[in-house]
Every structure is written in C-alpha cells, then in structure tokens.
Amino acid sequence: MEANWTAFLFQAHEASHHQQQAAQNSLLPLLSSAVEPPDQKPLLPIPITQKPQGAPETLKDAIGIKKEKPKTSFVCTYCSKAFRDSYHLRRHESCHTGIKLVSRPKKTPTTVVPLISTIAGDSSRTSLVSTIAGILSTVTTSSSGTNPSSSASTTAMPVTQSVKKPSKPVKKNHACEMCGKAFRDVYHLNRHKLSHSDEKPFECPICNQRFKRKDRMTYHVRSHEGGITKPYTCSVCGKGFSRPDHLSCHVKHVHSTERPFKCQTCTAAFATKDRLRTHMVRHEGKVSCNICGKLLSAAYITSHLKTHGQSQSINCNTCKQGISKTCMSEETSNQKQQQQQQQQQQQQQQQQQQHVTSWPGKQVETLRLWEEAVKARKKEAANLCQTSTAATTPVTLTTPFSITSSVSSGTMSNPVTVAAAMSMRSPVNVSSAVNITSPMNIGHPVTITSPLSMTSPLTLTTPVNLPTPVTAPVNIAHPVTITSPMNLPTPMTLAAPLNIAMRPVESMPFLPQALPTSPPW
C-alpha cells in the first residue's frame, strides 16, 4: 500500500519537479550533511573563491576556482633585487630607466555569494536546494552572456563587486641631512648621499675605474664588451643612447613642450635647471671686448673673439689671467665703483651749473668767463704778431681769434694755420715788411670788420689756400688800403667765397693775380 501511494505521489508531481531533479540529485550528498536544527542562525555570505567543506569537484569546476600558482622570484637585471611580482619589479626598474609607469593593472573584482534567507522547520532542505540551485544558475548564465537576474532565486540579494580605491601619493619620509631633499625609501636616500661625498665604492673589474653607483659601473662595463652599445632608443626620433637617464634627458630637452623653470628677470622659460643657469649668466656683469669695446657676457666673449680672428680668451684687467667667475665678480665690482664715481661727478657739475644760472651767481660767473676769454685772445694775438720777435714755430689757432687793438708788423717763417674763426674788429696797421715763406692755411671763416692798412711790402712766397667754400669764407666789410707793393709769386687759391663790400675792383690791384680774367668770381 505504501509503495503504491509513493508511486502515485511521484507520478503526480513529476511534471512540476522535473526541472529541479538534476540539481537535487547532484547536491543530495551535500544536503544530507548540511541539515541543521530549526533554530539555526542565518548563513553569512560565502565568497565564491572559498571551497565549502565536503563539496564535490563538480561544484568547484562549475564555479571556476583557479589554482594558486607557485611563487616565483622576480629579480632586477640592474641591481639584482628580488620582488614578489612583476608589477613591483617593473615599478622598481623605472627608477633605473627613468620611464614612469602609467597606472597599475586592475585586479579581478571579487564576487560575493548573496545572503541566504533564514531556514526553519522541515522546509530547510527545500529552501537550501533552491538557493544553491539559483547560485549555480547565476554563475552559468553570467559566463554564457545571458541575464543572470531571470534565473536567480527571489530570496537572494544582487551580486556586489569591490570598488577600486584611488591611489595614494607616495610618501617621502626619508630626508637628506645635508640638503633636505626627501626620498620614498632608504635605498634612494643612500644613493643620493653619495653625491655629497667623494666616495666611489664600485670598481670596474677590467680597468679599475671607480664609480659612485652600481648602474653607472654596469654601463661602463658594457663598453669593454665589444664597444659601446645603445639599447635605449627614443620612440619619437629613433636616436639611441647607452644609458636610460641620457634618454630621459633627451626627451625633456628636445621633445618635451613643458618649461617649468622660468627666469625671474625676463619672460624666458626652460625645461631644465641647467639651461636656466646658463641663461642667468646673461643677466650678470658683462666684459668689454679689448678689440671693439663691445660689452658682452663671459659666456659669449669667447665666441665673439672668433669674429675678430682670435681664439684666445681675454685677460682680466685685475689679475692678467683668463676670465673666470671670480675675476668677473671683481671686475664687475670695479666697474660699479667707477660708475658711482662718475655719477657723483655729474651731480656736482649739475649743482654747480644750477648755482651759476641762479641770481646773482649768474652775473658773476658770466663776467668771469668773459674776462678769461678776452685774456686768452689777447695772448694769442700777441704771440702771433710780435714787433720785435719773429714767429719761428708753427702757429695754430684752434679757438676764435679776435684782434681788438692795433697790431704791428712781423716776420713769419713757419706755417700759420687758422683752424678757428678769426675776427678783426679794430684797425690793423702793417708798417714794416711782412714775409710769409711757408704755407698759410685758413680752414675757418675770416671776418674783417675794420680798416686794413698795409704801408709796407707784403710778400707771399707760398700758396695761400682757402680749402672749402663752406668753412672758410672771407668777408671784407671795410676799406682795404694797400700803399706798398704786393708780390704774389706763387698761385693763390680761393676755394671759398670772397665777399668784398663797398670797394670797387679798380682799387684792389692784387685781385687780377688771384682771380680769373673774366667773371664769374
């Protein structure tokens, strides 16, 4: 009777339970050991990566748990330091190569098993079966690309994934005691400290040359192994370099458009500090070229000398040696002192001029200057035309010449050069012979505003040249009386205008000897 009743029940419910039959048969061994009393607490979320106790291998294959790989050491090729994974190795090698990593590869998100509802009474077996069946269907449908929500159990919460946290900035807690520069670890701090000392602990085994850093020694050893290789190639222009730091410097100097180092004096900007220091030399003290006198900075004085056909350096005016920064600073200070002295002298002269132009100092100073000028002109006239002493030395008049009193005759046997204006405002009487045996050059205007009388012979044995018509006009505005013979044996050249007012030509017999036979003249 019981067997027939059981067969009837299974036949009645065969259509409704046909879809869950496969999952129940595979999970019966697990469910037999997982039955709990009614007062059992809710089950906590179980990560998929965690293997349940007593689970068969089919569940492990369905969920897709990966086997742990054996740990392998990742060793740096530059300093032989070992790391636990390839990412940390590549991040460490970027310190040697100078190439920064863009970002760390993303981790695979962790999938969490949803929370299972409270299980109570005899229905615990059915609810547990349906829940685990829903989990299995979720995993299989998500791997095939279908929507997992359609086959998941109604008592299960949505699957959550871990959110990636933003990367924290690297802390640089290791500071140098000498310069204050900070580093992220002790290794880089110790490598930096070598720059403050002369210690070179790494020695080349071939040529015994010593280096401060091991990577520098490694690059040097490569030069002994069949020549210098250039394995580091620029991705932009294809140029090769033997060291990674040389490649990074090349990229910054040539291909980079960033100019973070700016000049405080002008608007120039540069990619590196070295180029900024080279530029700052232009704003320092300058040196004058000993050939052309042009002011140039010490950085460009050598190249400037090549334009004059010289390659040697200019010697310092202080120590007579080649120009250096110390000599430049001393010479710059000397130039500043000279400029300050010149400025003080100019200020004193300006103060004196202001005092002269003020009243009553203006009148006093004007009278003093006028008296000094009169004395100078009288002295020059007395030296030129002395009654008892002949002019035996060349006479050059470089200032305006005025004759304000009577002048007697004399003898001149040396050149007389009039390089400034000569003005006669009083009668000039020549009562004795006047002999001029050397050239007489008049390079400036000669103005005669008073009678000129010559009662004795005037002999000119050398040419009288009036060189230019602009700078040497001869103006005769008063009568000229010549009562004695006038001999002009040599040609008299008039290259400048000759203006004679209030006198007819017939009263001057000497003009036909100097002028052409017919006008214009």
Curated annotation (Swiss-Prot):
GO terms for cellular component: nucleoplasm; nucleus. Its main location: nucleus. It comes from the Eukaryota. Ubiquitously expressed. Highest levels in skeletal muscle and kidney. The keyword Transcription regulation applies. One of its GO terms (biological process) is regulation of transcription by RNA polymerase II. InterPro entries: Znf_C2H2_sf, Znf_C2H2_type. SUPFAM superfamilies: beta-beta-alpha zinc fingers. The modification N6-acetyllysine is found at K362. A zinc finger (C2H2-type) spans 74-96, 174-196, 202-224, 232-255, 261-283, 287-308. It is found in: Nucleus. GO terms for molecular function: DNA-binding transcription activator activity, RNA polymerase II-specific; DNA-binding transcription factor activity, RNA polymerase II-specific; RNA polymerase II transcription regulatory region sequence-specific DNA binding; zinc ion binding. Residues 140-155 have a biased composition (Low complexity). Residues 394-485 are annotated as: 4 X 7 AA repeats of P-[LV]-T-[IL]-T-[ST]-P. PROSITE patterns: ZINC_FINGER_C2H2_1, ZINC_FINGER_C2H2_2. Keywords: Acetylation, Activator, Cardiomyopathy, Disease variant, DNA-binding, Metal-binding, Nucleus, Repeat, Transcription, Transcription regulation, Zinc, Zinc-finger. It holds the Pfam family zf-C2H2_4. Sequence repeats lie at residues 394-400, 445-451, 457-463, 479-485. Possible transcription factor. Specifically binds to the CT/GC-rich region of the interleukin-3 promoter and mediates tax transactivation of IL-3. PANTHER family: MYONEURIN, ZINC FINGER PROTEIN. Interacts with ARHGAP22. It is linked to Cardiomyopathy, dilated, 1OO: A disorder characterized by ventricular dilation and impaired systolic function, resulting in congestive heart failure and arrhythmia. Patients are at risk of premature death. CMD1OO inheritance is autosomal dominant. This is Vascular endothelial zinc finger 1.
